[in-house]
């Protein structure tokens, strides 16, 4: 009989204890985000400053993240959410929650998982930051020539459309009022001046070659007139020297 009474008392105490534990747990489960609850004091209390609790019923509140150094606040901490950080100007975030800051890539580079990487041949990036390398422009697709080769920082510069002089090719002329009219006029003028200069040089070269050939083939044409002129000049000098003697001789005869 005594043992039975003892067993009943133990069972009653266990039931009472379980009810109390369940009541404590149920009290903490009812706490809202931004609060914490301790088992020995099952009361929902607000998180203190610089702490937060995104889930209610936690025994402690979490410490808010501090954004300093290369970080700045993107979103300030509240009682229910942690602070969000971002990198300062000139840096970019690394990691899913911006755990590290890395300096922005320079023009001619792109950001990869390993950091900043120089653009490969045939690509460029003219942006200062997190831009990606883009392929050079293919000028030949538009029927244009490459005026300036591209670099890792700048794209290819395409020239005016290539003009074909094939009889079967139809040359399209852009009106003067169009965007390419001025460029086409300049190109036409340049080609005309170049052609005229080449023709003039060819003509002068041929002229000198012909004169040189004639002078070598017929040297008397250039030398004979000079000889005749020299001989005539000598005869005139001789005559001018003899004439006074004849006059003197005649004068002497009259005196006798």
From Swiss-Prot:
Annotated TNFR-Cys repeat ranges: 24-45, 46-85, 86-117, 118-159
GO BP: apoptotic process; negative regulation of cell population proliferation; regulation of immature T cell proliferation in thymus
Tissues showing expression: Expressed in activated thymocytes, splenic T cells, CD4(+), and CD8(+) T-cells.
Signal peptide (residue range): 1-23
Disulfide feature: 28-37, 31-44, 47-61, 64-77, 67-85, 87-93, 98-105, 101-116, 119-133, 139-158
Record GO terms (molecular function): signaling receptor activity
Residues with glycosylation annotation: 128, 138
Protein name: Tumor necrosis factor receptor superfamily member 9
Organism: Mus musculus
Gene label: Tnfrsf9
């Amino acid at each position: 009989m005594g043992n039975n009474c003892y067993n009943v008392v133990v069972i009653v105490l266990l039931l009472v204890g379980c009810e109390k534990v369940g009541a404590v747990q149920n009290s903490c489960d009812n706490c809202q985000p931004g609060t914490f609850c301790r088992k020995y004091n099952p009361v929902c209390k607000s998180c203190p400053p610089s702490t937060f609790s995104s889930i209610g019923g936690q025994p402690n509140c979490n410490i808010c993240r501090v954004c300093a150094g290369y970080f700045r606040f993107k979103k300030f901490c509240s009682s229910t959410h942690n602070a969000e950080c971002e990198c300062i100007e000139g840096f970019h975030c690394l990691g899913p929650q911006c755990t590290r800051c890395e300096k922005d890539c320079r023009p001619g580079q792109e950001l990869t998982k390993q950091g900043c990487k120089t653009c490969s041949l045939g690509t460029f990036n003219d942006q200062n930051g997190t831009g990606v390398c883009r392929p050079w422009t293919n000028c030949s697709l538009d029927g244009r020539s490459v005026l300036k080769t591209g670099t890792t920082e700048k794209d290819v510069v395409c020239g005016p459309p290539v003009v074909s002089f094939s009889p079967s090719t139809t040359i399209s002329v852009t009106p003067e009022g169009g965007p390419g009219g001025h460029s086409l006029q300049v190109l036409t003028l340049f080609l005309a001046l170049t052609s005229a200069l080449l023709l003039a040089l060819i003509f002068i070269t041929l002229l000198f070659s012909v004169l040189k050939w004639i002078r070598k083939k017929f040297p008397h044409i250039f030398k004979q007139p000079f000889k005749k002129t020299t001989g005539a000049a000598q005869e005139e000098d001789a005559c001018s020297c003899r004439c006074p003697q004849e006059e003197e001789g005649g004068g002497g005869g009259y005196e006798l």
